[in-house]
């Protein structure tokens, strides 16, 4: 599907759904958004505007040269977009799932071209801004500028959510709340660490793209000024994500220490029980021997006496352990 945004004579922006079979390209194009494009649609736009869009394999390459390249007439950017899926597990604990999608941006003749294979809230927000305030979007570079600005804001929202969840977890660990098991807490910590690293990778990806755009002579002064501000915000988010990872590592260390303490308590209980049972076991073993001459066995009260001695031998070590503070 091709969505074309054009500037009308009264300085408004109009969006049209373009059909290859029945329409010709309009004038005063601001942005061509290719959503789930067919091979024919990509070939048509490439031919009309003398563009070379990256293939699927090129879009997924991790080299810097595959993320951004520029020639005399065009700029092409392959950017990673984080898509947020909000799900709830059986206990109604909100968990964020993220997936990474690649969006291709290209500029030619001050027109922005985007290729994407999924819906993004960022695009919906930018589309609404363009239609509501068309004067703020003179060309395709203005759209790229606002696109990166919105994406950084959304990454900031994700980091804020991670920070809130990390603080909640830290409180649960320190106060030893029983609402979650250790397994669930470790799972949540691991999930938050994974989310943090995904967001940080996304920030690094945008920083590389914006740094390259700032070096381009195709970008005007006002856009570069705004990109510089956005880049400063992005760098502060990177620092914040690093501090978050340190906090999560600290929580994991505290939790691991608590698990070790609990394990030591269990081991101590079994150790005390073993030591306490050794004297009566010894007594029972002695009187279980099949010697012919054991005079005390002939006593009328031998059995209750031996049982009493065994009970005393159990209680005595426990009293000693209690006084020593081992229990």
UniProtKB/Swiss-Prot annotation:
Signal peptide residue numbers: none
Gene Ontology cellular-component terms listed: plasma membrane
Span(s) of short sequence motif Probable selectivity filter: 288-290
Membrane topology: Multi-pass membrane protein
GO terms of molecular function: cobalt ion transmembrane transporter activity; magnesium ion transmembrane transporter activity; nickel cation transmembrane transporter activity
Reaction equations catalysed: Mg(2+)(in) = Mg(2+)(out)
Transmembrane segments: 269-289, 301-321
SUPFAM superfamilies from the UniProt entry: CorA soluble domain-like (SSF143865), Magnesium transport protein CorA, transmembrane region (SSF144083)
Gene3D superfamilies: CorA soluble domain-like (3.30.460.20), Magnesium transport protein CorA, transmembrane region (1.20.58.340)
Locations listed in the record: Cell inner membrane
Keywords: Cell inner membrane, Cell membrane, Ion transport, Magnesium, Membrane, Transmembrane, Transmembrane helix, Transport
InterPro entries: CorA_cytoplasmic_dom, CorA_MIT, CorA_TM1_TM2, Mg/Co-transport_prot_CorA, MgTranspt_CorA/ZnTranspt_ZntB
Family assignment from sequence similarity: Belongs to the CorA metal ion transporter (MIT) (TC 1.A.35) family.
Matches recorded under PANTHER family: MAGNESIUM TRANSPORT PROTEIN CORA
Function field: Mediates influx of magnesium ions. Alternates between open and closed states. Activated by low cytoplasmic Mg(2+) levels. Inactive when cytoplasmic Mg(2+) levels are high.
Domain notes per entry: The central ion permeation pathway is formed by the first transmembrane domain from each of the five subunits. Mg(2+) binding strengthens interactions between subunits and leads to the formation of a symmetrical homopentamer surrounding a closed ion permeation pathway. Low Mg(2+) concentrations trigger both a conformation change within each subunit and a loosening of the interactions between subunits. This results in an open ion conduction pathway. In addition, this results in a less symmetrical shape of the whole complex.
Designated name of the protein: Magnesium transport protein CorA
Organism: Campylobacter jejuni subsp. jejuni serotype O:2 (strain ATCC 700819 / NCTC 11168)
């Amino acid at each position: 599907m091709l969505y074309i945004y054009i500037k009308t004579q009264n300085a408004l922006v109009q969006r049209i759904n373009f059909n290859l079979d029945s329409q010709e390209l309009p004038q005063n194009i601001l942005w061509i958004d290719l959503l789930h494009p067919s091979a024919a649609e990509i070939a048509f736009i490439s031919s009309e505007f003398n563009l070379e869009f990256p293939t699927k394999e090129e879009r997924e390459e991790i080299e810097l040269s595959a993320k951004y390249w520029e020639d005399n007439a065009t700029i092409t950017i392959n950017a990673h977009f984080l898509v947020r899926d909000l799900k709830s597990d059986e206990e109604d604990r909100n968990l964020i799932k993220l997936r990474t999608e690649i969006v291709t941006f290209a500029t030619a003749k001050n027109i922005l071209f985007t290729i994407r294979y999924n819906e993004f809230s960022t695009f919906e927000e930018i589309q609404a801004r363009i239609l509501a305030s068309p004067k703020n979007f003179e060309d395709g570079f203005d759209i790229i500028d606002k696109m990166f600005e919105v994406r950084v804001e959304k990454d900031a929202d994700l980091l804020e959510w991670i920070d809130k969840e990390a603080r909640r977890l830290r409180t649960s660990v320190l106060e030893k709340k029983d609402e979650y098991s250790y397994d669930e807490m470790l799972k949540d910590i691991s999930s938050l660490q994974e989310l943090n690293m995904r967001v940080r990778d996304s920030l690094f990806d945008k920083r590389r793209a914006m740094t390259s755009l700032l070096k381009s002579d195709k970008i005007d002064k006002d856009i570069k000024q705004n990109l510089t501000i956005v880049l400063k915000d992005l760098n502060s988010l990177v620092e914040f994500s690093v501090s978050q990872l340190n906090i999560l590592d600290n929580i994991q260390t505290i939790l691991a220490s608590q698990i070790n303490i609990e394990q030591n308590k269990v081991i101590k209980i079994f150790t005390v029980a073993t030591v306490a049972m050794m004297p009566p076991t010894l007594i029972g073993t002695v009187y279980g021997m099949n010697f012919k001459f054991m005079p005390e066995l002939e006593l009328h009260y031998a059995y209750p006496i031996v049982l009493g001695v065994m009970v005393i031998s159990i209680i005595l070590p426990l009293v000693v352990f209690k006084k020593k503070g081992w229990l």
